């Protein structure tokens, strides 16, 4: 359950631990969210401005409160009870907010993203100013934003019968190409798209792989104003409801296959073998095993491959450590990122060995099943077994891998630019994302382009067919998307029975980093930098760097299980998943049962095909909108100047993040400070020579004395211990050594 209670236990020590729980004890079930946020801000201010000792604990303390604050803002609930602060995430699509209306929920979700948007806009100030005030021989981006009065007059003339609807609004698709310039303003089309993307409330996330960006323009406007923007990018690998819909999920596969007869079941398993052989053929195994092993793998062969993968990963980690700790300026770098060629080779050796072992294991299991004399009696039990589930999953993943990056795209950006949103411009953008022009542009751009990851695994260029047959998307809000609701393109406009429908497939869980602010990200990086200096954008590391940072930092900063760590990456921003099939045989094509897609129209004549979609939008959606009288006033009232991004940035509120630094001055005697605080501040703080020595080296030079024993015995008897003396006499050394096996964690230390 997403909304189960999870203990929030920071790994803090000494006074920092005591202070955290003192602050947390102020939080009850009835404490308002705003009050909780103020408590977090108060503690962050204390550790930044007032606390001047123990830099390591200061960093962790700030990071913990930043993370706690972001979780609260993302509608996590907190309550201190029996010495522990418990947190739970309300399911916005469930009972926790069943009385909340769609507008209220959308307003709440927008508020979560407002801070990160401000941080983002401040970072783009120079770009925004350049686009709005471009200088000589160029016109401002404002020229591409329609005036409300002008658009209102145009569509009103249609309503009164003065002009045809085809004359009033004339949409067309413009593919953004590198270095192309807009003929009306002289601005780069890529920068025009980028500017309008910054008007979105959601953060801009760049993803590696294939990307196609579009401007939707209005030729009826003197400057061909931008009606909307779209971006199609590589699909997310794991979306369960989508994979169920297509047939790539082993659970759905098994539920379907157990309903067929024995002969049909055997054919289905033979198809799985085809998937596996295709996957194996995509791996360069020349340095891993022989062709005979691939043909007839044994359990021993598979284990040797797994051992090889483990060794390769150890080598990769060592190469990465060497790069971080040593002088590697002269090391040849990989094209994948800021890593060495050696680290890259180790990465792909691991990937090849892992994938080959998994595929060969599945191949052996399924082939043994097919060849079994008692197949009819055992195949259903095979489907229910752990071995069978694993083998089926591996085969389906192999087939999905073949198409996920070449036959499918995700509509990650889709929306209208005001004032065209008032005439359902968003629906136009969504329809055009499935148009013949998009299918044509995709094939033209990627038909001869090798797949980077597949090519590296194969050891040679791999060019897969660039036949786009599926476009997916997710709504911004879980409460529904009017943009995709009831949205379909009837086949009748192309003289076919095949309708293109944006079909609701299911829901995503709220999972990711959208609720984590930039300040929190930087604070987590600062607090855990020793462990995370190898987090990068290189293929092979797993999820996005920000997601890995969040997960790893939670494990280091909080006393939590792996399941709890993952749950803290969740937020209440669930989304609806939609999908649109672009070919009559999309499923059979993606499942390898047919070799070519059967599109709904002749893609060679993509221009007229796309125009039919535009005509359909005008007659189905725009025309009905013209009969809604309030629209004219809303379009007329559109504030073009207020829409300019520069007018949405508070110039007096520049965002900044200050790293915590060790106090370098000698603290002065303060008569108001007593006890531990006086002792702690008497000297220069906690940073000593031993703070900067690795634990292994410290252990090597440590000599255990009676002092170690005396400290432990005193702590176990419930005493607080103060180590005092002269700087450099080994106090920090002793404390760091005792921390390794320290059991009395409630004991308080005042270093130096």
Tell me the role of every PLM-derived stretch.
Residues 718-736:
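Walker A/P-loop nucleotide-binding motif
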Residues 431-432, 737-741:
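Active-site signature of alpha/beta-hydrolase-fold catalytic machinery across serine-
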Residues 2-662:
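Extended, composition-driven regions rather than compact fold-specific motifs
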Residues 440-444, 722-725, 749:
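Short, flexible/disordered secondary-structure transition segments
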Residues 697-699, 724, 746:
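AAA+ P-loop NTPase catalytic core and its hallmark functional loops
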Residues 212, 719, 747:
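Short coil/turn segments at beta-strand junctions that form active-site/ligand-binding loops
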Residues 745-752:
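Conserved catalytic segments around the Walker B and adjacent sensor/switch elements
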Residues 660-718:
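A short, basic N-terminal segment
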